[in-house]
Amino acid sequence: MDIKKIRLDFPMLNNKTMQGKPLVYFDNGATSLKPQCVIDAICDYYSNFTANAHRGDYDIAHKVDQTFDAVRSKVANFINAKDKEVVFTAGTSMSINMVAYGYGVKYLTENDEILITEAEHASNVLPWYKVAEQTGCKVNFIELDEKGRLTVDNLKKALNSNVKIVSLAHISNVLGYDFDVKEFSKLIHEVGAIFLLDGAQSVPHKKVDVKDLDVDFLVFSGHKMCGPTGIGVLYGKYDLLNKMDPLMTGGGMNTKFDMCGNIGYQHPPLKFEAGTQNIAGVIGLGAAIDYLNSIGLDVIEQREKELKRYAIKKLKEVDIITIYNDDNDSGIITFNVKDVFAQDAASLFNSYGIAVRCGEHCS
């Protein structure tokens, strides 16, 4: 891996901060920087072949159709899914809401349970609270161990025949711990529940194979994987997508409708993609996947682990720093400066050109 060459791919790293310092960007959990190839792909669409997707019957429109559909295939290959199982969304939050309202509200009743953890991002908590509010079902929490990790034993304690949905972050955005997804999937399916995996912090950093993991839904965002904002993915097993109601209705997602209120829906994934899609975002996502693949996810994962070990070693040399997750399997490092308010520490780092996230991290 040629790090100097890779750094040149990101225009923002060539800029100085407002304090005139070189940018040291450590906020990739919130959003990643964008390589020039992604920016170019978006600009190319806006400059050279702007048209709506699956609407027009002229050459430029056909090129948009082909490009749009090619990205769906690219995403499917990236996670080992089928094209028809890949739905484009506005991001992870929207993807979870689509499952919550399209499946949860439709099928859950007052005797049912949804399982999450207290370490989830707000986007994987609030939609389920709304499902509970509308259906009368209960949201319960899988207990974490003393370090904030998910364990098989604690999952077994929480599972029962009333559990219908389990929704978990593959990697927590705060502590960065991974867990045995395949074993969890097996146990969850044994009680007849469905399993949604929030891959916002995993898909950009490691290989995620939906068939191998046997998850029912996988959600993730483009902007955390070198892609643009406003684009995300909902993967769902096709039979489950077929059973779901669409969160939104509008042009392109219907086969027919009449004055009596009868509506015929397209088959998934088009059934969930009402109106004009974020075409530039889709194209940018495709370019981001190409970029990550050109480096190799295995290479990226290994490099992140090396950097994490180095950072932990250096942070431990500073007596006033407390690290909370030095043994996790991801590149997320959570720490405090003793007796210093987190926002004050972040402001100090900022004065040196160092960008970090502080506070509650949406959790």
Question: Which residues does each predicted region cover?
Answer:
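Pyridoxal 5′-phosphate
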Residues: 1-363
